[in-house]
Amino acid sequence: MMASSDSAAPLPPAALAAFLRGCERRGAVFAELQCGDTDRGDVALAAALRAFRGNAAALPMADWPVRFWSLLAATPQLRADGAHAHWSGSLAALAAPAPADRAALLLRLAGGLQEAEAAEALGIDGPAYRDALARACPRDATGQPDAAGWRALAEAIQQHLR
């Protein structure tokens, strides 16, 4: 009996479906909060899901998370604020950062990615990612990073995920 060593064998559709189920809600929240518009975020998510489904089988499963998030972050709808962008209440701090910096923050807080994965998804190195994250961090009245503001924003995003 010969064991198959073909690593290019097609992945079972169940593996792809399970992966997408696991990241779809986080992706929807990331997209909405990145552009400040639910409808625009839904369009971006749908485009990223289509693109991901089209090439996932050619990738090792270990590469799927970074590939999915990089496709989503690169959609045109999420690279600039739309005309109807709005962040209110406990999410109002998301209006201040530039879109690229906001993406760094949201990959961490909504996407749940670690630093290295988030940097790779954005196509930047670790120091550039940390700089973007620092720029996106809520600030206090003196312009210093606001730890309480960061915690409040992180909690608001977690509530939004639920």
Residue positions per predicted region:
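Helix-turn-helix DNA-binding motif, specifically the short coil turn and the N-cap/start of the second
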Residues: 37, 114, 124-128
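Σ70-family region 2.3-2.4 aromatic/basic alpha-helix that recognizes the −10 promoter
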Residues: 24-32, 42-83, 90-91, 133
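Short amphipathic alpha-helical boundary/capping segments
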Residues: 88-98, 120, 125, 140
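Short amphipathic alpha helix immediately N-terminal
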Residues: 96-121
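A short, charge-rich alpha-helical start-of-domain segment used by transcription regulators
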Residues: 2-29, 39, 102
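Extreme N-terminal regulatory/targeting segments of RNA polymerase sigma factors
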Residues: 1-7, 155-162
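DNA-recognition helix of helix-turn-helix
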Residues: 122-158
